Amino acid sequence: ETAAKNSQDAAAQSESAAAGSASAAAASATASANSQKAAKTSETNAKTSETAAANSAKASAASQTAAKASEDAAREYASQAAEPYKYVLQPLPDVWIPFNDSLDMITGFSPSYKKIVIGDDEITMPGDKVVKFKRASTATYINKSGVFSVAKIDEPRFEKEGLLIEGQRTNYFVKSNTPAEWTSTSNIDKTNNGVDEFGFSYAKMRTKDNMTGQSSALSLHTCSASRGIDVSGDNKYCTVSCRVKAPDGLRCRLRFEKYDGSVYTFLGDAYLTFGTLIIEKTGGAANRIAATATKDPVTGWIFYEATIEAVEGETLIGSMIQYAPKKGGITEAGDYIYLATPQFENGGCASSFVITTTAPATRSSDMVTIPTENNIYNRPLTCLVEVNRNWGDIPPNVAPRIFDFSGVPPIESITYAFNTTEKYYGQLYMQTYKASTSTYVSSVFAGRTDVRKFIGGFNIYSDGTKRVVSNGEATKTMKTEWTGVKTRTFIRIGGQATSGTRHLFGHLRNLRLWHKELTDAQMGESIK
């Protein structure tokens, strides 16, 4: 019985072991199947990766091809685009003077001296590319930040339009920069005065309470005709100017009078209405008065000027700057005009402000020169320069100069200047000498009379013809006998003599000369 029991137990154990072996075999089969599946997946992934790599290589090749095509297209476009400009781009000038913020030349020859600052020391240094500049007095100007500035003797004045070049002028308003001492009527309160943030000395010229309800004008500064400008000689023009501000509707009146030695006579007025900047002229001499007003959008000051032309029999002319109430109205309590830089001068346009004390004061002429030596020799000769004239309908003198030569025989001379005849005033011409007829021959005039700012130039060609250019518009060519300059002398820029009788009264910048012929496209520069 016991043996039978043991035999049953052994059989049970053997059955259990067989079941475990079957279970293990099933697990092994499952693992084998999973392994085969994983291998298949790995093979699939490998093929996918291989396909992706192939596609990436194809994309890279396509990208390189596209980049090469784009590069070729860009190079071709640049070549085509540049083709016309090979006739526009100018060669390096033989003489190049920027006149932007110094007297330094980029190319050309002019031995002179300039001042440089090293630390706290100012040193005068020699150089062979420095434009010569002289002026026997101080002078004022508006710097490139719009600030009123004073230049020392022989110091050039660079404004936003370039180098300012003016002739001699005298301001007949005394104490012109001392507002508290201006010769105003007693009915004006000028105690509120000072210097604004742009450096202008001003006074707030306020009407006193006793003038409320009145309609008369009131003087703010005066130059009596008995102490005024002598117009009995060659000079027939007088110009009064100032900077003003006031509430809209009020008016500033510029008045002219004459004096014959015993009697003062009213000539004419120019009324400026604040807000609209409309100018109205009245009086018997109204048709002889030209007036303009321009507002500076930054400082707010309105530069107001009026010029009168004297007629036969008039000897002394004076002027007044005045407050006037609204047109058709009366003075209201607290009416005022801000006034700065009053000037009354001999000439057909306003010039830079001249500071005076107890007597009229004169600003000397700006004299700008370079030698002809190593700068101008023979033809061909080409010139371009940026010009800004500060005068309008009335030229400051006969033929204001851009440049000419000093003391040369007529056959060597060149005069590049403005025409001042009534029909062509403000247009450019270039004059040379014709030995065969012993006459000076001017080119056809170029430019518009109403344009003050432009790029001017001229050509003297190898074939003995010449022409003038203004803002890219050229005149027809004409014959010239000019062949060159042999005399060692000076090129006078923007003026002729210290008397100021041929001065520009304006600005020059970027003066260039070439000893070669430029194409029409290269001469086509223009500005507004």
Language-model segments: residues:
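Extended alpha-helical stalk/coiled-coil segments
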Residues: 2-90, 94-97, 104
